[in-house]
């Protein structure tokens, strides 16, 4: 029997992306039993209405991406739990690759834009350099071999989020997951992922401020 899948998606004012995203998810994993959990930061548009119309479960958290992800992971019922963004930058056709990584026995499976077959339409030079610097620092300090650090398209075996004891409320959450997976000797796999441009709406990432948050996350977990 195929595993039950939970997909956790933090949202804030993503109404224009909801239908295409949820239709894309369904088209790829319609042969699985699955749930979609929208963790909404009190959107001012019709994100919640559209998500519910498409059959998603909606819960609320407005403390930041990390807090929303932690709340969604805690609510998920699936044997395999997947985190993805709402802006269509994460391609639904890669879902089965993330599922396969957990089915193969890994605890965490992480999309990487820097493996062969991966890439990005939305990574200016400053972000490329920043990501590579953060990856190098983490690999040196923690003895890991990651290629990507700040990318949220990931899958988890059930129970892994409790083992990780995540604390980050903001954009440091992906870095915290990577570091704690290494520190707790979890089996982690990177798979190629191609990041598309945000389809609609306003991005929430702020390179300088969020870079400082990521650096703080790296250092505080030493």
Task: Kindly label every feature range from the protein language model.
Residues 1-24:
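N-proximal low-complexity "stem/linker" segments adjacent to membrane-targeting elements
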Residues 4-6, 35, 176:
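Cell-envelope/extracellular polymer assembly enzymes that use nucleotide-activated donors
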Residues 23-33:
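Short, acidic, metal-binding catalytic loop of nucleotide-sugar glycosyltransferases
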Residues 40-48:
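A conserved acidic beta->alpha catalytic loop
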Residues 61-63, 67-75, 92-171, 196-219:
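Acceptor/aglycone-binding surface of glycosyltransferases and processive sugar-polymer synthases
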Residues 81:
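Short aromatic/hydrophobic "clamp" motif used to bind/position activated sugar donors
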Residues 85-89:
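The conserved acidic donor/metal-binding loop of glycosyltransferases
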Residues 160-164, 170-187:
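A short, conserved alpha-helix in the catalytic core of glycosyltransferases
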